[in-house]
């Protein structure tokens, strides 16, 4: 059997082995010298308070961006994107790709928030973590429920015996997982919180007080930092764990995050200039930006685009109307019927000027640098030498002429087209009038009133859609609301019944692991995120069936069933993405990064990852180094060129070494 076939069956893969060569990120290695002597403190901002610190349960970035710095799992990402040892000092996978065995390091400990040693980290802690997640219906169960043998039966109550689930502590320092099918991306899942350990004794002692958002003592820590304090809408502070097993790779002594409500867009740059922040996102549309440009003309750096995709979601099953401009049931019914019509949704997508939208954040010159035209980034994976975006372009063309000349590359607006918008709307209007729909269609869109750039973005969206389609046809009704009120009807809504909007740009996704399924699985009927993305929940939903999501789910399942041929697998996922693109149920807008910043982070020293929780830009602090002065654009470019070359070599070497893990 050829080595390549063994590795495919064994289910091991790097970050898609060279697939990402066309992409880079703002985090990793550099030759720049960092400041020395005094302790380094990383000062930055945060924008959303965490609901809790429960890394085993929460899928919210507001939680995981914090806990990934406090808790270590089996593996983590280095500054080149390789998966390297963390709690596991070594691992093996069986030749059939079904059994992963991890050998834990013996110097790993649990510590209290005061830094006092509590216990050794043992294999049973990983078993306890998964059991707790299953028993408490973790928001991230979708990551592993169908992967780990017996877990689905346990979650669905077919068995109450957790020992039948494919995770076991072979001994104190060996944990083993048995999968249902090979997964080439399994190891990348180990960076996610649901597969982190928890000390069972501590967990029981805390009960329902475990992992409370404002209580650092409600957690144990085995990671690089200890949480010192959280004050809602004020600050979050970490301190370096002085006894951490890998403390030599923790270069900052403290992390201090200050709450930013987004109202004064120029404030981060002002704080950076005063030395109060280590890095600052810039707002080219702010009144003070010309001053920033003058003072830091050589230091403005645009971070490369990452794998986080932001979108406009369409609520296909709205139930709440506490925040609406609609004055009658007829208007509510008309909007619902319009949003169920694919031609109408496509008209919205083609009518939306994303460049103008992004310019509210990046300014006119930098607007295109953050644009995204596909839910899954076009370079996320490739098959037979073609990027994922190229595969989708080929497949979506079969849905209609409107797609034949669309460019899905990043950093340009391949979708905005007034003529196409009008043509699709004309088709939609004819069909909707036959259904008795009243025009104009009113679309309620909530926005945080304190976040100036967010308000300006949705105002831009309103302007371009209404300009393209006419206010006699479509009116976007913007609802400016308090921060918590917006979050409670979008991001933090407990159920679809509380999703009180027609269209929303409070929608985004960062991939959990290195496979297209991480994007596509979550919006199948029954998926955890259908309420936030599309306004419905449950597997059997009439609206979801009406818009064709059962067909979509079938395409995703067909791709997931391809376990041995990666090229065929990605081709099939491209087919599913093509269906989703044509449906216009999700309208892509931007990536998370691709924005202008000022920074004292030594370029490319922080961990890098296209997926998982251990390499988020500006949110992963292990490895990160600081320098005394702001990085110049010239320094950054030189460091990036060096890092790209080193990363390619490092990834290649890591890929070659995978064979030794197959036993």
From Swiss-Prot:
Signal peptide (from-to):
1-22
Q: What disulfide bonds does the UniProt entry report for this chain? A: none
Keywords from the UniProt entry: Cell membrane, Lipoprotein, Membrane, Palmitate, Peptide transport, Protein transport, Signal, Transport
The protein here is known as: Oligopeptide-binding protein SarA
Report the membrane topology from the UniProt record. Answer: Lipid-anchor
Kindly give the PANTHER family that the UniProt entry links to this protein: PERIPLASMIC BINDING COMPONENT OF ABC TRANSPORTER, PERIPLASMIC OLIGOPEPTIDE-BINDING PROTEIN-RELATED
> Which portions of the sequence form the region Disordered?
637-663
An example GO biological process term is: peptide transport
State the organism's lineage: Bacteria, Bacillati, Bacillota, Bacilli, Lactobacillales
Covalent lipid adducts (S-diacylglycerol cysteine), residues: 23
Q: Where, subcellularly, is it found?
A: Cell membrane
| Major localization listed first in the record, in broad terms | membrane
Known function: May be involved in the expression of cell surface properties important for colonization of the human oral cavity. It may also be involved in uptake processes.
| Keyword Membrane belongs to the record | yes
| Lipidation sites (N-palmitoyl cysteine) | 23
């Amino acid at each position: 059997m050829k080595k390549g076939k063994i590795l495919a069956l064994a289910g091991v893969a790097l970050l898609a082995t060279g697939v990402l060569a066309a992409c880079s990120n703002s985090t990793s290695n550099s030759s720049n010298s960092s400041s020395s002597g005094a302790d380094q403190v990383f000062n930055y901002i945060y924008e959303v308070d965490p609901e809790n610190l429960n890394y085993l349960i929460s899928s919210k970035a507001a939680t995981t961006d914090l806990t990934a710095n406090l808790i270590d799992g089996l593996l983590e990402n280095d500054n080149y994107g390789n998966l390297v040892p963390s709690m596991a000092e070594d691992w093996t996978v069986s030749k059939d790709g079904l059994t992963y065995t991890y050998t834990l390091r013996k110097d790993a400990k649990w510590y209290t928030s005061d830094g006092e040693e509590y216990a050794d980290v043992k294999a049973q802690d990983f078993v306890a973590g998964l059991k707790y997640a299953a028993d408490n219906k973790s928001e991230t169960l979708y990551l592993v429920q169908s992967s780990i043998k017996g877990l689905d039966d346990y979650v669905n109550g077919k068995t109450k015996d957790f020992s039948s689930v494919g995770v076991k502590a072979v001994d104190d320092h060996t944990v083993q997982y048995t999968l249902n099918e090979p997964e080439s991306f399994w190891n990348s899942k180990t960076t996610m919180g649901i597969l982190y350990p928890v000390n069972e004794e501590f967990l029981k002692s805390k009960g329902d007080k475990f992992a409370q958002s404002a209580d650092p003592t409600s957690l144990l820590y085995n990671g690089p930092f200890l949480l010192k304090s959280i004050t809602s809408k004020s600050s979050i502070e970490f301190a370096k764990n002085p006894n951490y097993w890998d403390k030599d790779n923790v270069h900052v002594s403290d992390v201090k995050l200050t709450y930013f409500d987004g109202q004064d867009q120029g404030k981060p740059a002002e704080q950076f200039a005063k030395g109060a922040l280590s890095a600052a996102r810039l707002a080219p549309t702010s009144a003070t930006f010309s001053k920033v440009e003058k003072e830091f003309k050589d230091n403005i750096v645009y971070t490369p685009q990452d794998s986080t995709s932001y979108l406009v979601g369409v609520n296909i099953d709205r139930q709440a109307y506490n925040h609406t401009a609609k004055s009658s049931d007829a208007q509510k019914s008309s909007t619902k019927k319009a949003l169920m019509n694919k031609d109408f949704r496509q008209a919205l997508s083609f009518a939306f000027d994303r460049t103008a939208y992004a310019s509210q954040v990046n300014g006119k010159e930098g607007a295109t640098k953050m644009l995204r035209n596909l839910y899954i980034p076009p370079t996320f994976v490739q098959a037979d030498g073609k990027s994922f975006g190229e595969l989708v372009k080929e497949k979506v063309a079969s849905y209609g002429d409107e797609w034949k000349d669309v460019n899905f590359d990043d950093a340009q607006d391949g979708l905005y087209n007034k003529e196409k918008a009008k043509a699709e709307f004309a088709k939609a209007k004819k069909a909707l009038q036959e259904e008795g729909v009243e025009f104009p269609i009113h679309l309620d869109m909530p926005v945080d009133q304190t976040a100036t750039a967010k308000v300006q973005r949705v105002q831009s969206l309103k302007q371009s859609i209404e300009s393209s389609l006419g206010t006699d046809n479509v009116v976007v009704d913007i609802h400016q609301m308090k921060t918590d009120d917006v979050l409670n009807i979008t991001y933090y809504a407990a159920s679809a019944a509380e999703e009180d909007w027609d269209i929303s740009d409070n929608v985004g996704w960062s991939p959990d692991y290195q496979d297209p399924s991480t994007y596509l699985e979550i919006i199948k009927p029954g998926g955890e995120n259908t309420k936030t993305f599309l306004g419905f929940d449950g597997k059997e939903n009439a609206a979801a069936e009406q818009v064709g999501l059962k067909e979509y789910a079938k395409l995703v399942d067909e791709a997931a069933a391809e376990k041995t041929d990666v090229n065929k697998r990605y081709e099939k996922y491209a087919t599913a993405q093509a269906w989703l693109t044509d449906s216009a149920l999700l309208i892509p807008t931007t990536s998370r990064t691709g924005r202008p910043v000022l920074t004292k982070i030594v370029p490319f020293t922080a961990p890098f990852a296209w997926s998982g929780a251990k390499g988020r830009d500006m949110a992963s602090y292990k490895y990160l180094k600081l320098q005394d002065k702001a990085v110049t654009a010239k320094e950054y470019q030189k460091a990036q060129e060096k890092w790209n070359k080193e990363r390619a070599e490092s990834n290649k070497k890591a890929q070659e070494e995978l064979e030794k893990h197959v036993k």
